[in-house]
Amino acid sequence: SYCKSKKLAIDVINGPAVTALNKTGIEVFDAKLIVEQARVIKSPEELKCMKAAIEVAEIGINKMREELKAGMTEDELWSILHKTNIEHGGEWIECRILSSGQRTNPWMQESSNKVIQRGEIVSFDTDMVGPYGYCADISRAFVEGHKFNEDQKKLYLMAVEHINHNSRLIKPGMSFKEFTEKSWKLPDEYYGNRYSCMVHGIGLCDEWPMIRYPT
């Protein structure tokens, strides 16, 4: 046999294939982590593809902001991003994370037929697989009517501070541990509803690494 090793790492495989390989004496391992770590470093061509996906996502985001108005449903607003992606040669969207008003907390709820009310905050996460199959994962929050009340302004400015602080930290050679130690500290009142991670990789989809909040 040309396969001298008895261990084989595969990223995607079905059950019957694993069984068949096992019968020949080959032990199958999950290659996901190996492949994800290899995908961390992007080629110049990949970076161009990622920028193209981001550009399309930003076009869609701007259209959503312009067309947001009281009386439309969350689904109607979300459809603008999907339409824009397809119009520009994009592929698909992983999910439909968009919510308004009280539905924004807890986070991660998908768009619905809820009617957006005047002055409500609207938050969404694109998770958009755009042109060339690369993902643009961008979160944004708008307010219907574009006039923030004091509570909305406080939360929004806190989010901006959070993102800017952590973005400035990132540099070549920094360990995950150092990043975690120097990262922006969530106020105690919001820690319980924190996101699953502070930062994560991106490429064909959400990718490794994923750096969690300190506990």
Where are these regions (language model features)?
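Active-site neighborhoods and metal-handling regions in enzymes and metal-associated proteins
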Residues: 1-215
